[in-house]
């Protein structure tokens, strides 16, 4: 191809136009997106990231943030050490104005120590461990419910809903608490044990295991020997799959499993387990199969998700991250500035009633930075899908008494 003088003159003539357009476009605001995008938590991390990505795309379509487009800078935090390294890179190389994330408690626990020292706002959308917001940090804010609420709901579901459905005294049931041994599992299980004590329920086992374990046969054997009727299980996808596989291999299952989010929420888990997970209960973030009167806009988010990614959502983690990100992006807009103290003041001044977001949550933040109007819901796997069964205002199906194939 010959590069003619006419073509060259055209390029020269066009250059001022391109330059003027570039100068007319405001610089994008870089926002950090810190999630586990590889490793054992990658599926849940990616599903969570998609919610943030949708919220940012909506904000940009509506004119951006503070008159500028938002640019997401991704960081892969597959373990706490990597989370620290990635958040430093996001601040030093990408010059992010804030960090959004992160799904897992150990990751945000580590990364937020770095951002707090630097005075960079950190908006947590999905890690539930209570201690995350109990360290006296000024610039860490969390939109989602906490582990204590998950623990309370899982136990109350047995006491107030499941036992009456079975026609038995809840105190006659043998409950077992099973959890992975990191921040997520330890926190949820601690609140479960405390709630069981308060209600006088019979806990026959309280077992922990490493999330990277490859053998849970001894766990299954102890649960079988204890005669557990209900297992309250807190775990990630790989260990949930392992637990189900070894229950099947050993020919045992409890009368019911009640999950606390994590791996119990994923459509991929249900697809892999098959009919064995039918009827399993799960306390978690709002899922897409919800009465929209309680979660206005949830179905619109699902439609946008399917259009953007060409598939159905894998869990409600995308919805939770979307709702939280929209909330915090609106806060930044109202603050009128990226100044950390103005952002903190705007967060603490936020006052939205329950049902004001697509996840059905409201927004009112305490001095610790925790949203006190975010609550989990109770779901059940029915016909291969996870549907909301409690609270009644959000339910799209009735609670069923049976579990398993």
Which sequence ranges carry the predicted segments?
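N-terminal export signals
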Residues: 2-24
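Extracytoplasmic "Venus flytrap"
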Residues: 32-53, 75-81, 103-104, 178-187, ...
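Short, polar/charged alpha-helical segment
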Residues: 42-65, 190-195
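Beta-alpha junction/loop-to-helix N-cap segments that form part of ligand/metal-binding clefts
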Residues: 43-48, 63-137, 143, 209-216, ...
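Extracytoplasmic ligand/sensor domains, especially the bilobed periplasmic-binding protein
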Residues: 96-204, 255-282
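Extracellular/periplasmic periplasmic-binding protein-like sensory domains
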Residues: 247-322, 392-404
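Segments of small-molecule ligand-sensing domains
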Residues: 305-318, 329-388
């Amino acid at each position: 191809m010959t590069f003619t003088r006419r073509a060259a003159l055209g390029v020269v003539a066009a250059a001022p136009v391109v330059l003027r357009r570039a100068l007319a476009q405001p610089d994008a605001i870089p926002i950090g997106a810190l999630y586990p995008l590889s490793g054992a938590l990658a599926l849940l991390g990616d599903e969570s990231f998609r919610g943030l990505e949708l919220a940012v795309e909506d904000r940009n379509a509506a004119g951006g943030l503070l008159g500028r487009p938002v640019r997401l800078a991704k960081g892969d935090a597959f373990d706490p050490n990597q989370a620290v390294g990635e958040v430093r890179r996001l601040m030093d190389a990408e010059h992010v104005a804030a960090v959004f994330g992160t799904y897992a408690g150990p990751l945000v626990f580590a990364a937020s120590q770095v951002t707090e020292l630097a005075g960079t706002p950190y908006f947590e959308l999905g890690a539930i461990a209570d201690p995350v917001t109990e360290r006296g940090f000024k610039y860490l804010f969390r939109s989602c419910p906490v582990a204590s609420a998950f623990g309370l709901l899982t136990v109350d579901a047995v006491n107030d809903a499941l036992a009456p459905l079975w026609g038995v005294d809840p105190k006659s049931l043998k409950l077992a608490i099973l959890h992975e041994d990191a921040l997520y599992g330890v926190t949820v299980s601690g609140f479960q044990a405390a709630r069981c004590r308060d209600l006088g329920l019979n806990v026959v086992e309280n077992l922990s295991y490493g999330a990277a374990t490859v053998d849970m046969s001894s766990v299954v054997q102890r649960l079988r020997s204890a005669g557990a009727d209900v297992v309250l299980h807190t775990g990630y996808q790989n260990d949930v799959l392992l637990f189900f596989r070894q229950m099947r291999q050993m020919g045992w299952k409890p009368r019911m499993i009640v999950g606390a989010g994590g791996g119990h929420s994923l459509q991929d888990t249900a697809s892999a387990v098959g009919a064995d997970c039918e009827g399993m209960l799960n306390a978690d973030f709002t899922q897409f199969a919800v009465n929209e009167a309680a979660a206005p806009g949830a179905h619109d988010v699902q439609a946008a998700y399917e259009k953007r990614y060409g598939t159905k959502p894998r869990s409600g983690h995308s919805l939770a991250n979307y709702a939280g990100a929209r909330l915090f992006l609106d806060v930044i807009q109202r603050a009128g500035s990226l100044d950390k103290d103005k952002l903190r003041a705007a967060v603490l001044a936020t006052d939205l009633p329950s049902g004001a977001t697509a996840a059905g949550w409201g927004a009112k933040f305490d001095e610790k930075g925790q949203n006190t109007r975010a609550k989990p819901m109770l779901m059940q796997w029915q016909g291969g899908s996870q549907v909301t069964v409690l609270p009644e205002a959000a339910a799209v199906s009735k609670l069923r008494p049976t579990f398993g194939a």
